[in-house]
């Protein structure tokens, strides 16, 4: 999936997450995580984000994640909404994801 434009999904409310994405000129993934529960769940948050990016074959992006204790399912949903917005497609290609 090609990320064409910057996008934002989520809120800064307790129990939610705000994620910002922007395309990069390289194929790297620049991941910045700021979380109120990073000491306990930082590795799980990072793993979830990288799993979703790999599932949709996303490379060459900068991600800024401001987590306020979001559950894994909320993190995945916000990230999938973000990918759809940033790629300019109306819906995610569910049948193509791995």
Swiss-Prot record:
Pfam families from the UniProt entry: ACP
Record flagged with keyword Nucleotide-binding: no
Keywords, ordered alphabetically: Cytoplasm, Phosphoprotein
One MF term in the entry's GO annotations: prosthetic group binding
Chain positions with O-(phosphoribosyl dephospho-coenzyme A)serine modification: 14
Task performed by this protein: Covalent carrier of the coenzyme of citrate lyase.
Keyword Cytoplasm: yes
GO biological process, one term: citrate metabolic process
Major localization listed first in the record, in broad terms: cytoplasm
InterPro entries: CitD, Mal_deCO2ase/Cit_lyase_ACP
Name of the molecule in the record: Citrate lyase acyl carrier protein
Annotated localization: Cytoplasm
Quaternary structure and partners: Oligomer with a subunit composition of (alpha,beta,gamma)6.
Family: Belongs to the CitD family.
Residue stretches spanning the membrane: none
Source organism of this protein record: Escherichia coli (strain K12)
GO-annotated cellular components: ATP-independent citrate lyase complex; cytoplasm
Top-level taxon: Bacteria
Regulation: induction: Repressed by H-NS. Part of the citCDEFXG operon.
